[in-house]
Amino acid sequence: MVREHTHRVVMVAFPDAQVLDVVGPLEVFSRTARLLESEGRTRRPAYAVEIVADEAGAVAMSSGVEVVAARAWRDVRGADTLLVAGGIGFEAQLQNESLLSWLRRQSSRVGRLGSICTGAL
């Protein structure tokens, strides 16, 4: 069977998230997409990965490493899988009512909603 649809995986990052929680799962999806393509099992990339945050741009992780969010999470449309990173910054996100409200709305719009570690807000 040859895949026709590119599955969009969106990771929500936030300040002081764990960098492995953000990039680790995205690496798995990205590597899987390359493998499926190399085996001729897809006509287009099987997975497209994207990092989003409160605002587009650099987000400092708990290690001090920065990841770059392509867009603000509120601008996400058409995600198939939505993941929320974990890390020591999750406690501040528990007070981010606009993010929590957006995640609740997304739960009925995405195929999968998941979290990594403490990202289960």
How would you describe each model-predicted region?
Residues 121:
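Glycine-rich nucleophile elbow surrounding the catalytic serine of serine-hydrolase chemistry
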